[in-house]
Amino acid sequence: VMVTVPRSGRSVADHLRSGRDWSLNTIRGGLFLSPYNDLKLVAPEKKAALLHHYYDNSIQFLKCSQSEYSVVMSTRNVGNIDLKALLRYHEERNSPVTAVYKRVDPASLIPENTILQLTAKGEATAVVPMSKAKISPKTKQVAKSMAIYLMSTVDLIELLQSANQRGDMISLEELMRQAVIQHNANAFEYTGFQANIHDINSYFAANMAVLDEANFRALFYSSRRIYTKVKNEIPTFFATGSQCRDSLCGTGGYIEGQLDHSVIFRDVLINRDSQVKNAIIMQGARIGAGCKLENVIIDKDAVIGPNLVLKGTSTTPLVISKGQHVFQQAEVAVHD
């Protein structure tokens, strides 16, 4: 598995480490981290050096992988896809590229999302941004691209080498979109839970959507389990008088207050008489006694003092940053 890390790869590397929690710390293969060359941050002299070498890291990884097929996946989509079923679908068809899509209401998409243009035979002829798509007001569903593409490794290497020769310096996702146009790709429909994360608001909405039991089971309790890092912590403790409704709680926490429709990460403390509703409380956060939190995201290791009111809206959650300490009401804005 090769992960292309963003501008600052520290948090990604800190989470993945050696890949042991996913059995990726093997002698052969395993986990590879590759820096992403963000051209907005690259000095002009380095851009010149990257010309004709922009995809070298990916090519080297693919050659060393010795795999017959490769899957290119964006990190903006949350889902639980059966890659074996995708491979079977690909092998039964003639096109060298298979693209994955999900049928969704066009009203749920933003201009930056992309959709597949499908033929009557179910082939994808293009990947079009919503901002440029011509969709009838009567259209109830469109084929939203999940930015997942499958190709033979040999074909993918050739695609990257050709891009190097041309001097292309665009994202791998954009290259795959061009491959769809060139080859009339196979189109594989994904029917499970899917959420698109492109900003803080969509991240908040995706977490709230997972609290729906049907979505939760579709994502986490299908035949394909999702694994995360093992901490070997004790279960979260719920004190006498605490209340918890429609919430997800990680391990190692201590809850004295009230939880309603919230996602609580590991090792979180919520003190007595506090009310937490429609919130995301990340690892190691501390919530003081008598607080009222609604439509908020509390980042890792943040501390909220007692008797404070933190309130955002369902479309614009209030965010407390990582490690921030808030002890005065004047430090935060309250949105009604």
Describe the residue ranges of each PLM region.
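Unchanged
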Residues: V1-M208, I320
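Left-handed beta-helix
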Residues: V154, S162-D336
